[in-house]
Design a protein with these regions (language model features):
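Short coil/turn segments that connect the beta-strands within blades of beta-propeller domains
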Residues: 31-32, 81-82, 129-130, 192-193
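Surface-exposed loop and turn segments in beta-propeller and other repeat-based domains
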Residues: 61-69, 108-120, 164-182, 221
Length: 221
């Protein structure tokens, strides 16, 4: 369940809460709260947007956008006041979305950049200087990096044209799995406007491959 709790004194129940699917991702962007679908047969295959009503201290004005089943849209990145990007993890595309109407206005195809399967697994990106830097996880059917592809790929997308400008890669460190699609703090800029990307690798589960850490995309590059 999801609800606003302006006063934590006294008792709280879920009588006025918004029901969610199991482990449904929730993301706040400015005054909007987005609820993404869970996986499985019980999923509501849509993305819902609620607006925070300050005077009423409630989430109001729900608008939703239907999405294909089991495609894992998990985050939304604001580009302008009306435009946002929604990557679909298993589909290998990014939808261009009107935030106000929750309508799809376009699509960016990333499937040609996949290592072996049909999706390069676009994860959690960030906008800097008019460019959308979107890490590609490039994982196998076990949700782990390919043993023959231990590198970091990032799609660089022009936010004016919505076109892939290039794919940049870091291969020397043998890092992989750059960001998880539900964890926004795995990618950020510092005070110098450099982008840092956390790379999980095999999450420490493979004793022969323990590489993890950060890659950096310096400002101006």
């Amino acid at each position: 369940f999801l609800q606003l709790v302006p006063d934590i004194s006294g008792s709280i129940d879920n009588s006025n809460a918004i029901p969610l699917g199991f482990s449904s991702p929730v993301m706040v962007v400015d005054n909007s709260v987005f609820i993404f679908p869970t996986m499985g047969k019980d999923a509501d295959n849509n993305i819902k947007r609620y607006t925070y009503n300050l005077s009423a201290q409630k989430l109001t004005g729900m608008v939703k956008m239907d999405v294909p089943a089991n495609t894992m849209p998990i985050n939304i990145i604001k580009v302008t006041n009306r435009k946002a990007y929604v990557p679909f993890y298993t589909l290998g595309v990014v939808w261009i979305v009107d935030i106000e109407t929750m309508q799809k206005t376009g699509e960016i195809d990333l499937k040609p950049y996949s290592h072996k399967d049909s999706s390069p697994e676009p994860a959690f990106g960030i906008v800097r200087d008019g460019l959308y830097y979107l890490p590609l996880d490039q994982i196998n059917e076990n949700f782990m990096p390919y043993e023959d592809y231990r590198q970091v790929d990032v799609a660089v997308i022009d936010t004016k044209t919505d076109k892939v400008q290039k794919i940049i890669s870091e291969k020397t460190s043998k890092l992989s799995f750059p960001t998880r699609p539900m964890l926004r703090n795995m990618i950020f800029t510092d005070e110098h406007n450099d982008i840092y990307i956390a790379c999980a690798g095999n999450f420490g589960l493979n004793p022969t491959y323990l590489n993890n850490g950060f890659v950096c995309i310096p400002a101006g590059s």
